[in-house]
Regions:
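Short, positively charged and aromatic/hydrophobic N-terminal segments
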Residues: 1-14
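ATP-dependent adenylation/nucleotidyltransferase module used to activate substrates
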Residues: 14-168, 172-180
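Short, flexible loop segments at boundaries between secondary-structure elements
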Residues: 178-201
Length: 201
């Protein structure tokens, strides 16, 4: 998805100046990315006056794109809201951890990083480790975001992820399930999850 803006070479982002990338999101890629991003924000009412949103960054291209889109949204905002860029280290090796830090710096994304022991815990689980990992990650992100005064977390899932989730459910469990563009947390009162790239293909 973000490959249209950023190319990777030996694990490090090779790129133009971040100002040019920011400009390209709303010009060169206006139709492909920006317009669909804005449509999703408005159609599903994802951002309201006074929100403090934790943009959750895994280090991958989708979450990095989300971070840049949210920065641009704030810059061109019609409502007042605040952003925090949250990176959870579930047990990365030092090289991968540093890559995330370096790439965020190159993209001018001021990250807040915190640690968890998810990888260590999941290594000991035999049944459905991916499911357990995803649930634990979500819980840690909600908890840290709430600690920082946020009322929402934003994840980088896009349209392709939505379709994949539907197909996986149909093929493996015989159920039609999908990702919602936003949902209220059942375990963290007052917290909401949003997926601003929901309509971006």
């Amino acid at each position: 998805l973000i490959n249209v803006i950023i190319s990777k070479e030996e694990g490090t982002i090779k790129m133009e100046r971040y100002e040019e990338i920011e400009k390209s999101i709303i010009t060169t890629y206006r139709k492909k990315i920006w317009s669909k991003f804005i449509k999703g924000i408005k159609e599903f009412e994802m951002v309201q006056e006074g929100d403090k949103i934790a943009v959750c960054i895994s280090g991958g291209k989708d979450s990095m794109l989300l971070a840049k889109c949210m920065q641009e949204l704030k810059k061109h905002r019609q409502v007042n809201f605040d952003l925090v860029f949250l990176v959870m280290d579930p047990g990365y090796n030092p090289i991968n951890r540093q890559k995330i830090i370096n790439n965020a710096k190159l993209l001018n994304i001021p990250i807040t990083m915190f640690e968890s022991n998810i990888f260590e815990v999941v290594e000991k689980i035999d049944d459905h480790p991916c499911y357990v990992c995803a649930r634990m990650r979500r819980g840690y992100l909600y908890s840290k975001a709430k600690e920082l005064g946020c009322n929402k977390i934003a994840l980088g899932h896009h349209f392709d992820d939505v379709i994949e989730t539907i197909l996986m459910g149909m093929l493996y469990s015989g159920k039609v399930e999908t990702m919602m563009p936003k949902l209220h947390s059942q375990n963290f009162e007052g917290m909401e999850l949003i997926r601003p790239l929901y309509l971006v293909k």
